[in-house]
Amino acid sequence: EMNGIGFQDLDEIWWLESVGGHHWMAKRVPDDAYVVVPNQQGIDYFDFKDALGEGKNHLCSADLADFIRENHLDLGLDGVDPAEAEDFDVRAALGSHSDADHCYNTPRAWYMLRCLNPTTFVWDGPDADFTPESDDLPWCMVPERKITVEDVKYVLSSYYQGTEYNPYNRHGDLSRRGMYRPIGINRNNFVAITQLRPYMPHDLQGVEWIAVGSNTFNEVVPFYTHINATPAYLANTTGDVTTESFYWANRIVAAMADAHYPACLAHVERYQLALSTAGHAMLKRFDEQYLAAPEKDAAAYLTACNQQLADKARKLTDDLLSKVLFSASMEMKNGFARSDS
C-alpha cells in the first residue's frame, strides 16, 4: 500500500487507500476472498457508480471522480466518465509500475498468490499467466481452500521457497538467487494476525497472533485482546539487548540462523511447529475453562492466560536459542581439532 488501512469487525473487512491529493477510496473485501498488498497501490478495479451511489462494496471521497477527471488521470480508452465507471482501472490512474516495484513489490504479491492459489493459474515458466514482475496481479482472490493462521504466517514469512529466487539456494542455477525482496526479511520487527471469533463470547472473540523479529525464523503466539496488561516478556522491550525480551531473543536467533541456515533450519522448523501447536492447545483449554465456568472478571482471567502463553513462548524460545547457538558455534571458522593437524 502507499497509505493503506484495513478495517474489520465480525461481519466485514474493508481496505482503504489514500490515493494522494487528500483523497481516498475503500473497497469491501469479498467474504470468501483474501487480499495481497505489498508496498504500492493495491486496489485494482473500482466501481465508482457504487461508491457514489449505494456504497455497498465501494466508498470514496465525494470528489474523487472529479479529481481524476480534472487532472486527466483516467488512462482508459473506453471514454467512460470516471463517475460512471464500474471497473475503473485504479492502478493505471493512480498506481506505480516502476523498476523498483518489479524487484520490491510485485514479486511478493506474486509469491503470496502462488502459495494460496497454486493451481488456479500458471505462475512459473515461459507460459506463466503471471510472473514476479507482472503489474496486473489480482488484488484479491478466492483461495483454493480455507486459509488458516499457519497459511497467513507462512506467506508473511516467505522468501521464495521452491523457486530460483530463494536467497538460501545452494543448488541449481544460482544466478537469480536473492534478486527479489522477500517478505520474510532481516528487518521484520512485528507481525500480527487478527482473529475475530464470532462463535465465542464477546470478551473472548478477539485473539491476536503475534511474532517479533525476522519472520523467517520466528513463530506467532496467540494472545487474548480483552486484557489488563501485557506480559513483561513482550511488553518491556528497550534498546538493551537481552534474552529476557521476546523481541531480542528472536533477533539473536535470526542473526545466527541466517548465517548458518543449513545447520539451524531444522531447529527453527521444530520450534515453529511446537510453539504453534502449543498455542492452539492452550487457547482451546483456556476457552473451554471459561465456557465451563464464566469468570466475572474476564479481563483478569484472560490476562492470566496470556501470561501462561508468554511463559510457554519463552521456554520454547530459550530452548531454540540454545540449539541454534550450539549449531552456529560448531561452524565457527576458528574451530580446530587435533585430527585437523
Each predicted region: which residue ranges?
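C-terminus-biased signal that marks the final domain/tail of proteins
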Residues: M2-I13, H22-S341
